């Protein structure tokens, strides 16, 4: 990226263009009449001088006045006393999101009492004050005047009184600016101060100076700058480049994975398909481009060259392309490597890795993701677009009271707690210390009586709701109510029913067209299971559990003994550290290698995975698929075999993965075909909730519609298409807070159970449901959400279904919106296109047109448009030009309102916190004609002729033109009724690409035809007059200059360079002369190096006219003695055709030759010594010793071969001061040979020894360094995550203390491994938190080799969960002497906290530090410190601390004096307080 350039530099590159097109101005300032975007108040240690308290962000005395354009001002009403001051600006009475640099306070000094004015700009977050800055008065603000005024819509030529191009100082740095869209053309301008010529500045900042020229080569946005101190004037316009400048313009780079022009096809691709990837750069800005990609399955990184395919229609950008195809399912991670001379840039994904538009950096960046899935991957048709209902069986409905009390014990010999009141809240041991708690304090042992018969009894209710799939939480025998701790996989839990109950439920559900998915828990079992039997409850069965066998000293005595790894001390791995959930062990990294376990679950004829889909051989009484618990914590190959097993019973049966993040690696086609889409849930909540909220699983932060779209599109592009249309799109589950409570309502919480809270929450839920039911996937309803059930975190989220107490209005709404989905196939399998994503409104379209849905299935044509609005009521104009034709009529299935597409848009009325589901009316023709397949183009001088065949049902044709294949099309003609078209609006010398569409009588437009290229051009008549190069002395600073001329009638016979003419010099080494024979050994011969005799082509530059000809020149430096050959060539049509320089006859192509002879220096350099490279993954690092020479070393050439004897190919040249090189263009496992050749200034060469290297996958030593808060208890720091040997264990991976506040650990991990982690101090109660005390997302890295098989990660912990507040001083039980009458309390807490000391509130500084002086009485002083969140209540962030400080009593002879002094102090305090 580039800083502003001096005007002189800009003028040196100005090009003159004649075509001028109109453009509207774009000024990046708000109108003077705009409204304040926020409340801004200036706070600091001066506020007390204004009768306020210092650093008071709640002050109403220092609120700044909004002046428009983002500017605020505040002037102190009285003079501030002389002295030093600090201040900041806070927004909306909060430190959060402040408009200030967060790195420190701003300061000013007053030598004498003075009034001070503070300035703040909301748009740039800039702040200053009148002690250091004086703005130009409003009536004297600088403005642009000149011929540019009418071009940018800013008044008349050279009239300052009409100029609206007012420049403003947005950053308070005395640089005023104005931004506008400027059309292509030649302009002159100056800057005046105010609306007259009284004070004006021109070229070089000279007052009354010459006009400033500006020649703009293409329509572009330009910012004009004026420095009020130096009076210099400049712009940020960069003219077109003509060659390497060792810079890359970062702002012009672009790759957008959501735009099919840059990545086609969109989204995940099938094996064998080809994906086209493109990147944009400023035209002629980069010399080469490569794509570097990592294959997650093969564990290799490969670099592939890209090729320039053309430029944008306006000539501003160029495009590079690569096509990739993969024959195996995998996940690809890629970024771009771009070079221009000595500059290298990297272009990767954005910081959030959401796809879409990426980001350029100086170093390797985050990768874009591309999923490649098995072409045979599919899901059952009934899955795609069905509506799921999740049931927690114990809490849904009690259909059989006879089984309500069949359990004697829960876990071990713990009691069972049976509820007698269906409407009671679940027992929550978190509340055991609260008044009124009636539970037994034991987790998950309370039951309400819900059972399988209860579900069967309510199938008609579910059917009326529109449900077609039921997902049941675990139903197998278990000691707990959640049943994720399985006791016996072969039995239905006795409180739920038995096998016959199960079969009847399956049969009845299937009879009503409802499928059933079971919950499978195969990562762990219960410690109270028949398989583990920790408590010896099953000794009388005759089969030993693994734990009992271990107690007898021989774990093999149990048929389940090898399922678990029990250590000699009796400990074992429990899921996430819970000893109630012993984990199934892995052998060689997989549970499948535990044969008895694999046989039991997968391989046996009646293995668990198959049996429950086909109990006793009857598929109709079996379930239809599995939801699989903690899927990413079980080895992938276990799931591959699981898939193979269930496919023998029900092919493609659902395998729904529980995965809270990107699950693409599990969705490649060999196992899972759906996922619990928590990513969808979190995005929808963030958008609709519109405030920060910690729901216990994730911290939600407000986003707008554009960010919502980006996050949803990132899911769309990562998941295989059949999976995306079958994802479990949930809003809540048994693991999350109830969605109504997330949206603000909890019936059991007096702070959240008002009618207003409920009304708002219900509105939010309805809005979410509209989106959910209109979006592709399998929307899932968590039981009771549709009936108004609320609930907090587990276990409160598992309340009973409120039968008889339902919110019937909400139920009715859900039935309506679900059945709208069910009645419209387009909402199930129609395609998806974002139509509007701006601010509070999000709209997307669904289509089944031309009689086919997304998967090629035949359905009637239908179109839907779904709109949701979280803001105020409004009309939304939605652009439909690329989505559906004019005239199509729609009806809102929710409101009944009707709409029609007109002039390429549809205007939808949407209420506040409301939505619409527009469905096209039936009976409309939405089938377009077939696309044209035989379009042809013939290029001419100033024209292109197009032709094609007649298309059935077409009444007219539209013509589209671009400059590159695959996109950027502009419609250049419509309603063409012939099957030919001549385009005369072309510029000779440019490449054009055409496509044509067919349009029927209703306006339905076909897809684009086949693409054709055309090259209109002036024909070149002749090229020649190439000079003869004489005998040439070799040397690095001695180039050869070649001149030649070209003639093209109508092009070169005009003054100046012929537009779009390309000239190139070609040269090659021949090496068959006597001179070569004599000098070859010294100059040219490097053993194993094959001297290339191919042509090298370099661009030539126009140097002037020669009569009717244009003359060009190019240079090159010969680097070997002997004979060289050269020739020039010319093209007037982008290199599509070439004309070579002719001989004397003017007809025959003529290449000329010359001889290169040695210089006086014939002594070779000393040989560099190339060290043996170490083994690294995806790279080879070469190091060598420097060479010496009698004159000078020029550089080193690096050569590479796949054979020890060659041929060696030169891959790079480095300068004389560089003694290393990293080759990343390698493939792990391949063998490479290298040598380095020292080259002196006369091209004498000496080769090094040859080394052999084989890059391979080897472990990377990853060092994690973390800086922690200075108040952290000295109890150690751990790093917990999905590390292979310590999965999310906060007590493992103990770090080493490296400094007072730093810890470090080095772990060995495989390259390409994606690690998620957090820092903790031995337990999850002491895990890291964000700066506001909020839950933070998992940290994420991908292990890469940063060099020498190492990687370094540097992190900072903001806060800890267990330390919401810390007191630095004083310590508890501090004793001070009698003379100390007050003490300063210094502490640290989270941002935004409310802190009170002895019930007196104040606001801490932005960085969390606070200080407060507290008066001390004689004797023991009790200081009470309290902190709590300023917003939502959060028990973790609320804490009370009591400190005692004892002030000694004075000696007896001092008592009277001190008592008198204390009384005086108290009297003065009361006096000042009264004042």
UniProtKB/Swiss-Prot annotation:
Q: Where does Ca(2+) 1 bind?
A: 245, 247, 285, 340
Signal peptide location:
1-31
Q: Which SMART domains match?
A: Aamy (SM00642), Aamy_C (SM00632), CBM_2 (SM01065), FN3 (SM00060)
Q: Which cofactor does it need?
A: Ca(2+)
Top-level EC class: hydrolase
Return the PANTHER family for the record.
ALPHA-AMYLASE FAMILY MEMBER, MALTODEXTRIN GLUCOSIDASE
Name the record gives this protein:
Amylopullulanase
Please give the organism.
Thermoanaerobacter thermohydrosulfuricus (Clostridium thermohydrosulfuricum)
Underlying gene: apu
């Amino acid at each position: 990226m580039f800083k502003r350039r001096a005007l002189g530099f800009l003028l040196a590159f100005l090009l003159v263009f004649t075509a001028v097109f109109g453009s509207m101005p774009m000024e990046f300032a708000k109108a003077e009449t705009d409204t304040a975007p926020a409340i801004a108040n200036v706070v600091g240690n001066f506020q007390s001088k204004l009768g306020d308290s210092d650093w008071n962000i709640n002050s109403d005395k220092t609120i700044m006045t909004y002046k428009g354009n983002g500017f605020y001002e505040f002037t102190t009403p009285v003079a501030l006393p002389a002295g030093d001051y600090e201040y900041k600006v806070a927004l909306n009475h909060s430190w959060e999101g402040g408009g200030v640099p967060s790195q420190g306070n701003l300061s000013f000094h007053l030598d004498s009492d003075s009034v001070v004015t503070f300035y703040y700009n909301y748009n740039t977050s800039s702040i200053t004050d009148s002690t250091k800055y004086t703005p130009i008065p409003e009536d004297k603000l600088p403005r642009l005047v000149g011929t540019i005024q009418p071009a940018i819509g800013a008044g008349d030529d050279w009239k300052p009184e009409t100029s609206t191009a007012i420049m403003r100082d947005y950053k308070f740095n005395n640089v005023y600016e104005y931004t506008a869209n400027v059309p292509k053309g030649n302009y002159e301008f100056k800057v005046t101060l105010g609306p007259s010529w009284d004070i004006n500045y021109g070229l070089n900042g000279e007052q009354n100076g010459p006009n400033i020229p500006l020649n703009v080569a293409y329509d572009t946005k330009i910012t004009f700058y004026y420095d009020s101190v130096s009076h210099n004037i400049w712009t940020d316009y960069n003219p077109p480049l003509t060659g390497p400048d060792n810079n890359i313009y970062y702002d012009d780079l672009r790759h957008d994975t959501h735009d099919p022009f840059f990545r086609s096809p969109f989204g995940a691709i099938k094996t064998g398909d080809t994906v086209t990837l493109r990147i944009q750069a400023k035209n002629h800005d980069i010399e080469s481009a490569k794509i570097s990609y990592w294959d997650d399955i093969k564990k290799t990184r490969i670099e592939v060259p890209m090729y320039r395919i053309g430029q944008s229609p306006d000539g501003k950008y160029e495009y590079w392309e690569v096509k990739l195809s993969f024959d195996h399912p995998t996940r690809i991670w890629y970024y771009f490597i771009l070079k221009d001379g000595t500059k290298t840039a990297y272009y990767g994904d954005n910081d959030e890795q959401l796809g879409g538009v990426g980001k350029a950096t100086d170093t390797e960046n985050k990768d874009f993701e591309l999923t490649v899935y098995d072409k045979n991957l599919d899901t059952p048709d009934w899955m795609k677009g069905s509506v799921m209902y999740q049931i927690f069986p114990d809490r849904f409905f009690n259909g059989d009271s006879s089984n309500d009390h069949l359990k004697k014990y829960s876990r071990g010999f713990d009691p069972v707690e049976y509820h007698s009141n269906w409407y009671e809240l679940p027992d929550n041991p978190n509340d055991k210390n609260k008044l009124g708690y009636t539970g037994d304090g034991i987790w998950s042992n309370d039951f309400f009586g819900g059972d399988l018969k209860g579900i069967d009894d309510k199938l008609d209710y579910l059917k009326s709701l529109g449900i077609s799939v039921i997902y049941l939480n675990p139903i197998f025998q278990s000691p707990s109510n959640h049943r994720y701790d399985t006791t016996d996989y072969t039995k239905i839990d006795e409180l739920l029913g038995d096998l016959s109950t199960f079969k009847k439920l399956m049969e009845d559900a299937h009879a009503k067209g409802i499928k059933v998915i079971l919950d499978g828990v195969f990562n762990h079992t219960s410690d109270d299971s028949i398989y583990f039997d920790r408590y010896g409850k099953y000794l009388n069965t005759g089969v030993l559990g693994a734990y009992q066998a271990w107690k007898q000293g021989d774990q093999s005595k149990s048929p389940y003994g090898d399922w678990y790894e029990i250590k000699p001390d009796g400990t074992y791995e429990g899921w996430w550290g819970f000893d109630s959930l012993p984990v199934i062990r892995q052998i060689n990294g997989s549970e499948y290698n535990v044969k008895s376990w694999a046989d039991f679950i997968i391989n046996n004829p009646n293995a668990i995975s198959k049996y429950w889909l086909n109990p006793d051989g009857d598929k109709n009484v079996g379930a239809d698929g599995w939801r699989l618990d903690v899927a990413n914590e079980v080895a992938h190959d276990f799931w591959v075999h699981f898939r193979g097993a269930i496919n023998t019973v029900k092919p493609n049966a659902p395998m729904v993965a529980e995965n809270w993040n990107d699950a693409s690696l599990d969705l490649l086609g060999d196992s899972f075909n759906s996922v619990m889409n928590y990513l969808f849930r979190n995005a929808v909540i963030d958008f609709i909730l519109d405030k920060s909220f910690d729901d216990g699983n994730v911290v939600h932060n407000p986003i707008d519609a554009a960010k919502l779209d980006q996050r949803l599109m990132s899911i769309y592009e990562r998941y295989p298409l059949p999976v995306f249309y079958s994802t479990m799109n949930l809003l809540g589950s048994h693991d999350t807070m109830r969605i109504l409570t997330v949206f603000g309502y909890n019936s059991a919480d007096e702070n959240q159970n008002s009618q207003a809270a409920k009304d708002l929450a219900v509105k939010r839920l309805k809005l979410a449901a509209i989106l959910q039911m209109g979006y592709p996937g399998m929307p899932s309803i968590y039981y009771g959400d549709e009936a108004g059930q609320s609930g907090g975190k587990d276990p409160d989220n598992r309340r009973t279904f409120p039968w008889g107490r339902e919110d019937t209005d909400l139920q009715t709404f859900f039935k309506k919106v679900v059945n709208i989905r069910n009645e419209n196939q387009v909402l199930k399998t129609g395609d998806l296109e974002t139509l509007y994503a701006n601010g509070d409104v999000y709209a997307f379209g669904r289509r089944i047109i031309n009689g086919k849905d997304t998967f090629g299935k035949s359905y009637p044509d239908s179109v839907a448009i779904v709109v949701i609005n979280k803001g105020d009521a409004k009309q939304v104009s939605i652009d439909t030009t690329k989505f559906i034709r004019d005239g199509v009529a729609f009806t809102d299935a929710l409101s009944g309102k009707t709409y029609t597409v007109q002039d390429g848009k549809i205007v939808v009325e949407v209420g506040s916190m409301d939505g619409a589901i527009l469905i096209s009316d039936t009976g409309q023709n939405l089938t377009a004609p077939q696309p044209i397949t035989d379009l042809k183009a013939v290029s001419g001088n100033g024209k292109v002729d197009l032709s094609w065949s007649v298309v059935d049902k077409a009444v007219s044709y539209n013509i589209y033109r671009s400059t590159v294949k695959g996109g950027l099309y502009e419609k250049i003609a419509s309603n063409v009724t012939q099957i030919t078209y001549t385009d005369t609006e072309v510029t000779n010398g440019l490449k054009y690409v055409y496509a044509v569409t067919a349009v029927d009588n209703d306006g339905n437009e076909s897809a684009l035809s086949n693409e054709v290229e055309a090259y209109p051009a002036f024909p070149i008549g002749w090229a020649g007059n190439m000079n003869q190069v004489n005998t040439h002395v070799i040397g690095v600073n001695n180039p050869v200059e070649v001149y030649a001329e070209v003639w093209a009638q109508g092009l070169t016979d005009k003054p100046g360079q012929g537009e779009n003419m390309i000239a190139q010099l070609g040269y090659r080494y021949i090496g068959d002369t006597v001179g070569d024979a004599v000098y070859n050994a010294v100059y040219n011969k490097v053993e194993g190096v094959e001297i290339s005799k191919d042509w090298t082509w370099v661009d030539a530059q126009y140097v002037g006219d020669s009569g009717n000809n244009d003359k060009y020149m190019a240079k090159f430096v010969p680097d070997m003695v002997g004979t060289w050959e050269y020739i020039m060539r010319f093209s007037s049509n982008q290199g599509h055709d070439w004309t070579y320089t002719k001989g004397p006859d003017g007809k025959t192509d003529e290449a000329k030759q010359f001889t290169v002879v040695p210089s006086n220096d014939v002594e070779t350099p000393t040989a560099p010594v190339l060290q043996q490279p170490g083994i690294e993954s995806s790279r080879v690092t070469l190091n060598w010793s420097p060479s010496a020479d009698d004159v000078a070393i020029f550089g080193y050439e690096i050569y590479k071969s796949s054979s020890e004897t060659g041929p060696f190919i030169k891959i790079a040249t480095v300068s004389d001061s560089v003694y290393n090189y990293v080759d990343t263009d390698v493939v792990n496992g391949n063998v490479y040979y290298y040598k380095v050749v020292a080259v002196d200034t006369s091209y004498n060469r000496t080769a090094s020894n040859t080394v052999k290297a084989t890059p391979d996958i080897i472990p990377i030593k990853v060092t994690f360094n973390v800086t922690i808060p200075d108040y952290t208890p000295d109890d150690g720091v751990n790093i917990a995550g999905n590390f292979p040997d310590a999965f999310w264990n906060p007590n493992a991976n103990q770090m080493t203390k490296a400094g007072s506040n730093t810890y470090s650990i080095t772990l060995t991990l495989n390259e390409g491994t994606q690690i998620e982690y957090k820092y903790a101090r031995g337990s999850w109660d002491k895990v890291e938190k964000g700066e506001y005390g909020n839950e933070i997302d998992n940290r994420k890295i991908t292990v890469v080799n940063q060099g020498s098989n190492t990687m370094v990660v540097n992190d900072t912990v903001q806060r800890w969960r267990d330390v919401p507040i810390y007191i630095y001083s004083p310590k508890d039980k501090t004793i001070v002497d009698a003379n100390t009458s007050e003490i300063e309390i210094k502490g640290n807490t989270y941002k935004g906290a409310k802190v009170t000391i002895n019930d007196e509130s104040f606001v801490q500084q932005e960085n969390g530090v606070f200080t407060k002086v507290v008066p001390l009485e004689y004797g023991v002083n009790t200081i009470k410190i309290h902190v709590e969140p300023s917003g939502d209540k959060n028990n973790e962030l609320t804490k009370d601390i009591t400190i005692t400080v004892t002030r000694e009593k004075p000696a007896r002879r001092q008592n009277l004096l001190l008592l008198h002094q204390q009384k005086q102090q108290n009297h003065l305090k009361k006096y000042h307080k009264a004042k």
